[in-house]
Amino acid sequence: MSNAITMGILWHLIGAASAACFYAPFKQVKKWSWETMWSVGGVVSWIILPWLISALLLPDFWAYYSSFSLSTLLPVFLFGAMWGIGNINYGLTMRYLGMSMGIGIAIGITLIVGTLMTPIINGNFDVLINTEGGRMTLLGVLVALIGVGIVTRAGQLKERKMGIKAEEFNLKKGLVLAVMCGIFSAGMSFAMNAAKPMHEAAAALGVDPLYVALPSYVVIMGGGAIINLGFCFIRLAKVKDLSLKADFSLAKPLIIQNVLLSALGGLMWYLQFFFYAWGHARIPAQYDYISWMLHMSFYVLCGGIVGLVLKEWKDAGRRPISVLSLGCVVIIIAANIVGMGMAS
């Protein structure tokens, strides 16, 4: 396995670790509605940071974006909005299926759809089937999916042992939402594929290869921001128990604390895709679809490890932890299989 591929896998792991940890600061926010907290964090992660980083990277910010036609920008924006819809459905999936089943189904579907649909859309899926390296990477995707399934099973055993139940368990509604979440969340993978002309233009301007994907986040995350912020603002305006004014009428020290914690959560959320861009840049072009598989499987892996570190599994018993450990090992094996496939 080449050093470039190894570094690509490592950057994806770091990005996934940030994704697995980003909600920790949000959990410390007090006396704010979820909608206010999510909006503040979202403004930081989806608007401020993408624009700021792009302004630092590009020699002429406005000239760069105005150089693209609407036919180039619109798919990137719409796929970003598609991801935003998946993001909203994610929370509802947890509500009706519980954390473990919801995450397992949603992540499993988005891993498959986001990974395999890209080469199908690009018309080169047959190359993957007919080459040794392609077949090995596909095997890695399958093994990763098995690993996600094992971790999901561990979560179910943990919830059963600890008596944790879904907020409003509804299998039919939850499955529909999980499938929708999985499909729509893959919009981020599709957006990255559609944004290739933007990456190439950034490279032509002298932007370092590690950073060429970052300017496209202004458009991708702009689409996601409109969906997420629109959802939050509509709820803040229509739901009687929610009030943006009330949330910002608390004592000033608490408001400052909540803003800083939400901003930190937003920063950590953004960092997952900052390092995703770094990892993506190191993956061979013919296997760039693998970036999504690495990100999602490492997200599950890091989520399990973070849960152990935070002692969320302390009262789960030995069996769930053993199953979780097995799932994590399988995901690590999958990453190695994919790495060897890309190197062959």
Curated annotation (Swiss-Prot):
User: Which reaction equation describes what this protein catalyses?
Assistant: L-rhamnopyranose(in) + H(+)(in) = L-rhamnopyranose(out) + H(+)(out)
Asked if the record carries the keyword Oxidoreductase, the reply is no
Cellular location(s): Cell inner membrane
Disulfide bonds listed in the record: none
Give this protein's Gene Ontology molecular function annotations.
rhamnose transmembrane transporter activity; symporter activity
Q: Which UniProt keywords apply?
A: Cell inner membrane, Cell membrane, Membrane, Sugar transport, Symport, Transmembrane, Transmembrane helix, Transport
Where does the UniProt entry say this protein principally localizes?
Answer: membrane
Which residues span the membrane? Answer: 4-24, 38-58, 68-88, 101-121, 137-157, 175-195, 214-234, 259-279, 290-310, 323-343
Q: Which GO terms describe its cellular component?
A: plasma membrane
**Residues forming coiled coils:** none
Q: How does it sit in the membrane?
A: Multi-pass membrane protein
Function recorded in the entry: Uptake of L-rhamnose across the cytoplasmic membrane with the concomitant transport of protons into the cell (symport system).
The record's family statement is: Belongs to the L-rhamnose transporter (TC 2.A.7.6) family.
**Under which name does UniProt file this protein?**
L-rhamnose-proton symporter
Origin organism is Escherichia fergusonii (strain ATCC 35469 / DSM 13698 / CCUG 18766 / IAM 14443 / JCM 21226 / LMG 7866 / NBRC 102419 / NCTC 12128 / CDC 0568-73)
The top of its lineage is: Bacteria, Pseudomonadati, Pseudomonadota, Gammaproteobacteria, Enterobacterales
> Which gene specifies this protein's sequence?
rhaT
